[in-house]
Amino acid sequence: MIHFVAAGPGAVDLITVRGQRYLKEADVIIYAGSLVNKGLLEYAKEGCEVYNSAYMTLEEVIEVMIKSEKEDKMTVRLHTGDPCLYGAIREQMDILDEKGIDYDSCPGVSSFCGAAAALNLEYTLPEVSQSVIITRTEGRTPVPEREKIMSFAAHGATMVLFLSTGLLEKLVKELLAGGYASDTPAAIVYKATWPEEEAYVCTIDTLVETARKHQITKTALILVGNVVTHSHYERSKLYDPGFTTEFRKGRDS
């Protein structure tokens, strides 16, 4: 059996209980060495085979999985954050389907949740934004035409951008062209939840300058929207005394 396990955003203690158990039981661990906290490998039992996929191709990763399966070993494929976002897991799963090899997924904490925690943010504030757009700036990997930053920016919703720190000048131009005001709040969160985490609040207009000042060129998330400064929002209906729910009756004002 192959277990695709979410490593969490960085901090070792943010892996799930199930994910930790799988790591302890694994005979083989293939981890995304470019981003996964190597402290998680301390859960591996003695004799566990450990592979760093940063140095491997897809074919080489699959080869290890097939060998492990033939030897009746349990394999953990350890991906950063939650691999349902930019995790390149589907291509692995499709090949495993072709080979008739069973697998499952163990979800976890995505780095975009870690970024919110770094700034104590709520992405969905009443009367400010009730939607979160998770996307990336187009680089070497193309983005579908209908999913360009400009088209998403037109919504004015909260936006979380992965894989975009090295393309900030392009990102800023597209955000402004799409309709965001230049003074729209923004933030850069570097290595969210890691010991070396850094978080800086700025505006769209000062994103490039802020990243340059703090020498951040990769491994960061970009947050955009008025929720970043959490001002001018309305109180939630859920805890309003006059709001009736399944569990309590609202009181007349």
Please tell me what each predicted stretch does.
Residues 2, 71-75, 131, 139, ...:
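A contiguous loop/helix-start segment that scaffolds small-molecule binding in enzyme catalytic cores
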Residues 40-41, 61, 86, 114-115, ...:
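Short secondary-structure boundary/hinge segments and terminal tails
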Residues 1-109, 114, 208:
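Class I S-adenosyl-L-methionine
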